[in-house]
Amino acid sequence: MSSKGSILVVDDEIDITLAFKKGLESNGFFVDIYNDPIAALLNFKSDFYDLLLVDVRMPKMNGFELYQEIEKIDKKTKVCFITAFEVYYHALREIFPTLEVGCFIRKPIEIDDLVKRINAEIHSLDIDK
């Protein structure tokens, strides 16, 4: 694949996924988008995506639950959670004690800033996985 990387974007807001797809593809990334976390899980391709961009609050399955299910399929896939809300790490640890994630992106975000965060995550070393 000649792209900068492959990204799976999952957000229940169609305008967000379309804007991310357009902006990321124009910056050289391959992008798949889903507005339904269940459909994203059912169509997930192991060893294909370099990074998941997953909204925290979605109907049917929240972003943390989706990532936990995807991690059962592919432990190497990195994730950045996207949210319009403040993230409270202490409360998050109580609900998902095994979740090891350090990348949270606040919406709205400019595409240039998103690209920088994605590049940093894709190229970061992940010793545990």
Give a label for each model feature.
Residues 11, 55:
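Active-site residues of response regulator receiver
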Residues 58:
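Receiver (REC) domain active-site loop signature in two-component systems and cognate sites
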Residues 65, 86-103, 112, 116:
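Alpha4 helix (beta4-alpha4-beta5 surface) of REC/receiver domains from two-component response regulators
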Residues 33-51:
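Acidic, metal-coordinating helix/loop segments flanking the phosphotransfer/catalytic sites
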Residues 14-32, 99:
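Two-component/phosphorelay signaling modules centered on CheY-like receiver
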